[in-house]
């Protein structure tokens, strides 16, 4: 009957709601019609009622609450009916609860029916209401369990679950001997668990005095323990449990598992007191994830790790928990360890014997819980990761007895003859002969010349060489034997042992700048010093710590693992600009797979670019070069002050910068022997060229090195105008640049003829011959002089360095001819002492041709825009991933593996200081024929050497050109009635003679011979 009435009421409520809805619609329709009539609009333009009617949130909310209430009571009624029906069917003879047995004053059913019907009905009503309330409580708990909800904490339920103290049977621990570290860790863990249990008991019983906790029942004799009654620990525990009480008072609820046992409310099972007391800790462990069951703590978080992999895993967990605190699950053990920071070390300075962790006596297990409680089966074991106590005594091994070293019997040196101790004066000419052998023997000639020859003479006595002793007493080689074409000079101290290690023959041959004359020694005093440069600058904030390197290594492994490429970072090197991480691919992983992920890895790591080094010399791993967050400034003075630059003997030493580890990088242009520099605009190419020029100015005097500078941009190299090292003014016109290169070719031919006449193989040998003759007071005449009766004497020839700042512009002006001149210089100019430094910002195949690349093996690539440009310069990729601002790849001669170098910065202020300093010591000695295209008189017999025999019609062709003042191949061809090839050879011969200029960009040539001389 009740349900019928409830359903009728619900239907009436729905009908009332619909009626109110219809009334509202009619009212709204009436208002809209009135408004439209006022506006004069048509009725057909009215919107639809259902689409335009305003919403009534109050009606919807009322309807929702009414339906929800009806469904709830309907569900509760069905559940109660099913419960009562199943209870009566399954347990027909259920005993009467004890509470109803004590009702002596309640009349029976028969008495009440016969005597007083009203009393019986009231008793039955009270009993039914009590049963319904009890069933409602049961259904609420069941509904909460099914819906995975929380119910408020009821202390009476917890007290009912607690058994008496007599039911708890203590377990005696079994002790065994363990190490000090294990004892410290086990003692801490056991003490914390015991403390937790005792304080929970005291908290629930409202006790003020907390009993003391012992670590074990039977401790070892003489064991010194810091007990839990220590004042410091007591204050810590008081603060901890005050905070814990507030947490319990604010939110005290249980978490239930989704499983529910259907039992009678009066059927309870035995539960251990520890489980009921520790239930709040399990509740907090499962509360973070919003689940009903309490998760067991993560054992891996408490383990003590020592290897690299475990350390990296721990770092990852820490970083994830710091970044996402809302997603991390905080276990009960972690919460307790945070609340008790002072109680981590409770052991003294003695060995402790404690039960191991496998025999833990504090294992707590709940088997079953009645009346809808959870079924737990977990271990509440607290593990705290702590090292051994810092003040614990460690048993040291016995000291190793010291064994006295046996005495070594060293025989005394043999006596030295008096002949080697007497003062000796070398004869005349010995100093010059000794100087002539410096470049070949490389002995300590300076010590001999300065008076230190007595020590070396005394050392000869140990070898017993009488022949050398005789030569040291005055029997020297004659000057004819020391200098001549038929025999080679022998150094008198050739067999004397030297304190320095002997140099290789290749180094001696290539070190063309080691020779110095007497005049050079005087001029070298005026070389610039590093005081003209800015001091080195170091930024401590740009260095990376070991922790950052380790974190980056872990990130690299993780990011590559995301792309299914498993690698291992084995080492890292941090430099001023980049950091190289050496990775070892796993078995079966190809290096090309890492190379293909270059851009993806850079994007994943958040850096601008990454350079993958496929092969590292001397190692079996690959390299990943990542840019540093901040880069160091590398000053040029830092490279000049390094031992690598200061101890270099070559006059053509170039300071490049620092490598990836911060070590200075220098190279010798004489061994290069030519250098090709390429890079895009803004990559640091011009600054690198300035650093190279300053390196040679700091090393060589004008008598040793002369320069020809070609600067099409008229900005970079023009600041060197006026220094004494220049052979000609800085060339800014490309027409004159072709003449300068043509002069260099003629100078190369001249030097080759002179070296061939002198019988030497390089410029250093030629200068030695000149020095030897000057030491004897002789002069060697020029064999190719125009005045054979009175030839001019030969002088020392300096090195010539041709610097071209923009090679592409020079190629565009006179491409084919310039390419031929550059190729000839690159092929043959090394032995003649002429070296090239070519720089360009357009590294394309039409500028850097194959003929030029084949003759210039030493190359420097700054940042380029594409892989094609990198292949054009280095014949391999990599330059497109550079960082710019001086970051370069240096390809040394004789190797195919480029070296990454960070170029040194040379400011304009430093360059101006050095230039002004050099201008103080004299004006430059320019050679006029360099830019005019003419030649010196002594080269008239040399200039035609490349053409073999002279053409019989050459004089006629010259006459035709001078008369017509037109140097064209077609004009000579028509005038002399010859073929095109022969006429072209005649014009080229005139160009070599300096009669006509090189062809311009339009092909025209200029007559260089004045009209008066025609």
Swiss-Prot record:
Residues bound to ATP: 682-687
Cited Gene3D superfamilies: 3.30.980.40, P-loop containing nucleotide triphosphate hydrolases, Winged helix-like DNA-binding domain superfamily/Winged helix DNA-binding domain
GO molecular function: ATP binding; DNA binding
Ranges where the FtsK domain occurs: 662-871
GO-annotated biological processes: cell division; chromosome segregation
Pfam families to which the protein is assigned, alphabetical: FtsK_alpha, FtsK_gamma, FtsK_SpoIIIE
Listed Polar residues bias regions: 298-307
Composition bias, Acidic residues: 121-140
Keywords linked to the UniProt accession: ATP-binding, Cell cycle, Cell division, Cell inner membrane, Cell membrane, Chromosome partition, DNA-binding, Membrane, Nucleotide-binding, Transmembrane, Transmembrane helix
Major localisation: membrane
Assembly behavior: Homohexamer. Forms a ring that surrounds DNA.
Protein role: Essential cell division protein that coordinates cell division and chromosome segregation. The N-terminus is involved in assembly of the cell-division machinery. The C-terminus functions as a DNA motor that moves dsDNA in an ATP-dependent manner towards the dif recombination site, which is located within the replication terminus region. Translocation stops specifically at Xer-dif sites, where FtsK interacts with the Xer recombinase, allowing activation of chromosome unlinking by recombination. FtsK orienting polar sequences (KOPS) guide the direction of DNA translocation.
Entry remark concerning the domains of this protein: Consists of an N-terminal domain, which is sufficient for the localization to the septal ring and is required for cell division, followed by a linker domain, and a C-terminal domain, which forms the translocation motor involved in chromosome segregation. The C-terminal domain can be further subdivided into alpha, beta and gamma subdomains. The alpha and beta subdomains multimerise to produce a hexameric ring, contain the nucleotide binding motif and form the DNA pump.
Family: Belongs to the FtsK/SpoIIIE/SftA family.
Protein name: DNA translocase FtsK 2
